[in-house]
Amino acid sequence: MHTTLPESTSENFEYYDLAEACDMGDIVALGTVFVVILYSLVFAFGLVGNLLVVFALINSQRSKSITDIYLLNLALSDLLFVATLPFWTHYVINEQGLHHATCKLITAFFFIGFFGGIFFITVISVDRFLAIVLAANSMSNRTVQHGVTTSLGVWAAAILVATPQFMFTREKENECFGDYPEILQEIWPVILNTEINFLGFLLPLLIMSYCYFRIMQTLFSCKNHKKAKAIRLIFLVVVVFFLFWTPYNVMIFLQTLNLYDFFPKCDVKRDLKLAISVTETIAFSHCCLNPLIYAFAGEKFRRYLYRLYRKCLAVLCCHPDHLSFSSSLSESQRSRRESVLSSNFTHYTSDGDASILL
């Protein structure tokens, strides 16, 4: 079984040297309950939040910016990822498992969405670095066309990096697992874990940390009353990414060591198995926070949610005329406020998009 996929419910024992059996039955049962509940919550909140981002960007009447392109692709990556969670929930509670084609396809979507989401978070960090720290030099490159080209490259990279994770996946006796060739059985799981640790965590974290550190240096040198909020949001982005993904990646690293029998005691193996189930769910729930951190903290997304709320209220309360009139007034007021806000930021960003600071 891949390290980031739900563990099989039928593998209740693990065997080691001297034919010693390590009973995992209670850990598997507890992990199954935990995974089913939290995967369902992550799916529900992740689906709603990221769909709102997609609808807000598509329905926005303003011209699209490069930031919008990246936010849209981040939301699509998260949607692709959370769309697989009901299948894994079904897998851990149903003895029939998944059909071969479904097993292969869902595993592929899972890892493409997994790496795609992290890669787009990293790209957004680099884009903000270019927009704020290198504003003058990057102005001509930060176009929508450039954003589309970069996004296609990120998707290609996500597919390429995800391929080793699902290329050997198959269904056998109601189990969806990695069936590696004999020559690769020992080294391939190590390669997969190392790929997740490095390309899925360490490298993105280093890039994000550098970009946001340089951004904060630039903001501290600017005399602007909005910079305190921007710095808090930047700090939030890095801290949330670190807190949600670090425990899981530590467990993946310990699991790699376990492949070399660094933890011979059964109790340690049991604790590690449970810890992976807990920390992976915490890490996966990060996709529920992406809309809040990257999108809804921006003015345009709050405006969209407000308009959506008023439309729903109009339908429920049967006062469409009144709400339409007040909405037009508030839209005019928001437009004036937006123009003032935009002018406050254009002196140190290359596109004047306030969301670039989030």
Swiss-Prot record:
Extracellular side, ranges: 1-26, 90-105, 169-186, 254-275
Post-translational modification: This protein is not N-glycosylated which is unusual for G-protein-coupled receptors.
Keyword ATP-binding among UniProt keywords: no
Membrane disposition: Multi-pass membrane protein
PANTHER family in the record: CELL ADHESION MOLECULE, CX3C CHEMOKINE RECEPTOR 1
Subunit comment: Found in a ternary complex with CX3CL1 and ITGAV:ITGB3 or ITGA4:ITGB1.
Record protein name field: CX3C chemokine receptor 1
Organism: Bos taurus
